[in-house]
């Protein structure tokens, strides 16, 4: 009986194994039969996997491994997961048939062709292909929700808003990113400025506050004392004008007749006072603004005081006169502004300013008016003097600070070495090249006489007028208005036009000589390059003024680019451009009257020759003097002798010149100086000798000779009048003599020796010595 049971159990197990093998074989056969049909579906799945990379990872986790497939348990699972076609109910089959078209829609017609003929490439598989997907059943029975759109290869949820709103938001964000930081900080919305004032500011072209205006607004508006320093042309006037006007607008005012001013603004010049007054008037229609300065009748000013004044702008002299006459009451002052404070507190105005302010100020009183000091230059002594007018808790805003460059960063600084006898003619050429007939130029002179003479010099081809203290005030105002309006292009002025004047579109500023103090240079150069525009400032200097130029460089934190006078080529090129622009301004009605003459001229000379002659005559460049690029002397041409190695001394160049051109070249070469790095020299020769020199000279591997078209870069500025020199004029240091021998100063003949020693007499030596070291020392240090 037990044996029978064992045999029965063994038979049952054998039967079960046979059934399992039979079932496995049937399943494999069915898979082989279904494989061709499922190829296409698998390709669809692969296509979907490229679209949904995350789903592919889920599939891999869901599919069993080969090891699991071989185990009995896995076989049962597989059997359940993949029932045969016979086991599928008719209802399930019908559902599958309905969902098959949805799966087919996923694949584009182009993809279908690829899957039928060949397998897709790696690029096609890897490339993201965003598609709108509905819920669909995959081969493993999993369902997938509608897929979000892909953006840059990654899922990206659809926005709640419509596409036009999204695009507008993106464009707005881009615009915000493009707005400079200065405009964001200076936006009107950041400050308590009324809509009426904003409208008036926009009428002046102001759409946001400049940095100095933004950083000082709240200090001024809150009533704090302030010292502010910023570069020229950055909008310092509106820095105090806007907040003061808003403050007065917000206060209840008794606008009765004869009221005393609440704001006093003192300026050093009449022109600046007039300009500041206009700036106030342009941005307020409710307040009464008056401007008092010398050279104008008293009657009109008395009438303004009788009617009542809210804001008074003026120069110290006329304000002081009204106080002494008992006509002007300053006891009600709440705000005092000193514009260009360094000049207002200097020796020329200090006594007058103190007398004016003593009326409204009490010593060590917290009830004194609010004091506002503005300038582009604030030396240390200004702070010491200003403290007696300011409260102990004053604010300081400095947009220059410890920065090296004190001048406007939009101005290019150039320097031309020129003897005073040639200066007027060279200035005329400089205006042609750097400004032209259509541009505006301001020339600053040290004296009234020089300004008057230069404005009438025939070398300046453009219309020019002068502006200085000897001109009646009425004429000064007419002249300044004409220059602003473009009635003439060149203004020759003394320092009356140096400070504060905001003249639009000044292309060029010329200083006839280095100023005595660096503050004057900073303010003069600041007449160009204003409000973001670029400009050029050219300073003329003589050999004896080179030390002053170096001092300006060091104190103003700038570096002059030493240039030569404009060459004939540059002058003609600039003049022709001006002439062409002038042709555009000729009306068609005038042209018709000259057509017959033009046709006749073309027949005689040809079109090009006739037009070239006409342009030359229009430009005034019928004859252009050739000038030295080194010292501006007329009748000379500058030549460059380049050397392939660094020259030990200047006699090295003399030796080569004499070998090729003969000893007579000694009398023709003038003012030889080293090029940068001592890789050659440049010198002047008479214009008549240029052709002869070029014919005799032959370039070699070491030496090349050419005519200079612009001033080459020379071997460093000679600071303090010392160092090695290659010019006949000079100071202490070595000299490059004309005979080609290097000697110490004090030797004109004989062997090389110590300073002051000569083989040929002592008196001349002593005189030479005195002209050397002692003389240059006194020049350098003002002794």
Curated annotation (Swiss-Prot):
PTM text: Acetylation by CREBBP/CBP inhibits the helicase activity. Deacetylation by SIRT7 promotes the helicase activity and overcomes R-loop-mediated stalling of RNA polymerases.
Domain Helicase ATP-binding: start-end pairs: 217-396
Keyword tRNA-binding in annotation: no
Comp. bias regions, Acidic residues: 167-179
UniProt entry keywords in alphabetical sequence: Acetylation, Antiviral defense, ATP-binding, Cytoplasm, Helicase, Hydrolase, Immunity, Innate immunity, Isopeptide bond, Mitochondrion, Nucleotide-binding, Nucleus, Phosphoprotein, Repeat, RNA-binding, rRNA processing, Transcription, Ubl conjugation
UniProt region (3 X 5 AA repeats), positions on chain: 724-748
Effect of residue 137 to Q: Mimics acetylation; impaired ability to resolve R-loops
The organism's place on the tree of life at top rank: Eukaryota
Localization per record: Nucleus, Nucleolus; Nucleus, Nucleoplasm; Cytoplasm, Cytosol; Mitochondrion
Pfam families in UniProt: DEAD (PF00270), GUCT (PF08152), Helicase_C (PF00271)
UniProt-listed Enzyme Commission number(s): 3.6.4.13
Sequence repeat windows: 724-728, 734-738, 744-748
Entries under Gene3D superfamilies matching the protein: 3.30.70.2280, P-loop containing nucleotide triphosphate hydrolases
Result of changing residue 600 to Q: Mimics acetylation; impaired ability to resolve R-loops
Cross-link (Glycyl lysine isopeptide (Lys-Gly) (interchain with G-Cter in SUMO2)) at residue(s): 116
Subunit annotation: Homodimer; homodimerizes via its N-terminus. Found in a multi-helicase-TICAM1 complex at least composed of DHX36, DDX1, DDX21 and TICAM1; this complex exists in resting cells with or without poly(I:C) RNA ligand stimulation. Interacts (via C-terminus) with TICAM1 (via TIR domain). Interacts with DHX36 (via C-terminus); this interaction serves as bridges to TICAM1. Interacts (via C-terminus) with DDX1 (via B30.2/SPRY domain); this interaction serves as bridges to TICAM1.
Comment block on domains: The helicase and foldase activities reside in two separate domains, the helicase in the N-terminus and the foldase in the C-terminus.
Protein's UniProt name: Nucleolar RNA helicase 2
């Amino acid at each position: 009986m037990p044996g029978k049971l064992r045999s029965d159990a063994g038979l049952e197990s054998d039967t079960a194994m046979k059934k399992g093998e039979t079932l496995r074989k049937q399943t494999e056969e069915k898979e082989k039969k279904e494989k061709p049909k499922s190829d296409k579906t698998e390709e669809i799945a692969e296509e979907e996997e490229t679209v949904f990379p995350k789903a592919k990872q889920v599939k891999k986790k869901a599919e069993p491994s080969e090891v699991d497939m071989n185990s009995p348990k896995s076989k049962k699972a597989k059997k359940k997961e993949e029932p045969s076609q016979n086991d599928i109910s008719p209802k399930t089959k019908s559902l599958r048939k309905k969902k098959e078209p949805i799966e087919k829609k996923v694949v584009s017609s182009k993809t279908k062709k690829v899957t039928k003929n060949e397998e897709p490439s790696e690029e096609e598989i890897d490339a993201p292909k965003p598609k709108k997907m509905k819920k669909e059943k995959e081969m493993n029975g999993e369902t997938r929700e509608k897929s979000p759109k892909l953006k840059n290869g990654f899922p990206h949820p659809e926005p709640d808003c419509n596409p036009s709103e999204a695009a507008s938001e993106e464009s707005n964000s881009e615009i915000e990113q493009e707005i400079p930081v200065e405009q964001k900080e200076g936006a009107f919305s950041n400050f308590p400025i009324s809509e009426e004032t904003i409208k008036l500011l926009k009428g002046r072209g102001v759409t946001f506050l400049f940095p100095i205006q933004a950083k000082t607004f709240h200090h001024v508006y809150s009533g704090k004392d302030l010292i502010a320093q910023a570069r020229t042309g950055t909008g310092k006037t509106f820095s105090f004008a806007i907040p003061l006007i808003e403050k007065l607008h917000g206060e209840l005012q008794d606008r009765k007749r004869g009221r005393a001013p609440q704001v006093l603004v003192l300026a050093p010049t009449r022109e600046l006072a007039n300009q500041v007054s206009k700036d106030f008037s342009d941005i307020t229609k409710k307040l009464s603004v008056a401007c008092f300065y010398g050279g104008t009748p008293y009657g009109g000013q008395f009438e303004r005081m009788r009617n009542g004044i809210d804001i008074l702008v003026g120069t110290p002299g006329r304000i002081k006169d009204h106080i002494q006459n008992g006509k002007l009451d300053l006891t009600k002052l709440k705000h005092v502004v000193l514009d260009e404070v360094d000049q207002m507190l200097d020796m020329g105005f200090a006594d007058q300013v103190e007398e004016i302010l003593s009326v409204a100020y009490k010593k060590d009183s917290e009830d004194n008016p609010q004091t506002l000091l503005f300038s582009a230059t604030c030396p240390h002594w200004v702070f010491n003097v200003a403290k007696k007018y300011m409260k102990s808790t004053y604010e300081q805003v400095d947009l220059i600070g410890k920065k090296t460059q004190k001048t406007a960063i939009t101005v290019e600084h150039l320097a031309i070495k020129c003897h005073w006898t040639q200066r007027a003619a060279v200035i005329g050429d400089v205006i042609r090249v750097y400004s032209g007939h259509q541009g505006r130029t301001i020339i600053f002179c040290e004296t009234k006489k020089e300004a008057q003479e230069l404005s009438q010099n025939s070398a300046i081809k453009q219309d020019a007028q002068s502006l200085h203290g000897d001109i009646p005030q009425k004429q000064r105002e007419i002249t300044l208005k004409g220059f602003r309006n473009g009635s003439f292009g060149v203004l020759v002025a003394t320092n009356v036009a140096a400070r504060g004047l905001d003249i639009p579109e000044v292309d060029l500023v010329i200083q006839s000589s280095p100023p005595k103090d660096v503050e004057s240079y900073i303010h003069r150069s600041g007449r160009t390059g204003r409000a973001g525009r670029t400009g050029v400032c050219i300073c003329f200097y003589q050999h004896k003024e080179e030390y002053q130029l170096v001092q300006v460089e060091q104190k103003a934190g700038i570096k002059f680019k030493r240039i030569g006078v404009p060459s004939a080529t540059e002058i003609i090129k600039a003049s022709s451009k001006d002439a062409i622009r002038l042709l555009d301004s000729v009306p068609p009605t005038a042209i018709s009257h000259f057509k017959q003459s033009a046709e006749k001229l073309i027949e005689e000379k040809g079109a090009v020759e006739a037009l070239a002659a006409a342009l030359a005559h229009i430009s005034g460049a019928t004859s252009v003097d050739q000038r030295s690029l080194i010292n501006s002397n007329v009748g000379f041409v500058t030549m460059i002798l380049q050397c392939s190695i660094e020259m030990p001394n200047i006699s090295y160049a003399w030796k080569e010149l004499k070998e090729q051109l003969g000893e007579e070249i000694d009398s023709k070469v003038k003012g030889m100086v080293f090029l940068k790095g001592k890789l050659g020299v440049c010198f002047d020769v008479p214009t008549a000798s240029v052709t002869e020199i070029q014919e005799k000279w032959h370039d070699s591997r070491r030496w090349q000779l050419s005519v200079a078209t612009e001033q080459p870069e020379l071997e460093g500025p000679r600071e303090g009048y010392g160092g090695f020199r290659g010019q006949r004029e000079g100071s202490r240091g070595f000299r490059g003599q004309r005979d080609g021998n290097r000697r110490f100063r004090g030797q004109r003949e004989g062997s090389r020796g110590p300073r002051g020693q000569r083989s040929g007499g002592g008196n001349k030596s002593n005189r030479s010595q005195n002209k050397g070291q002692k003389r240059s020392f006194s020049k350098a240090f003002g002794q």
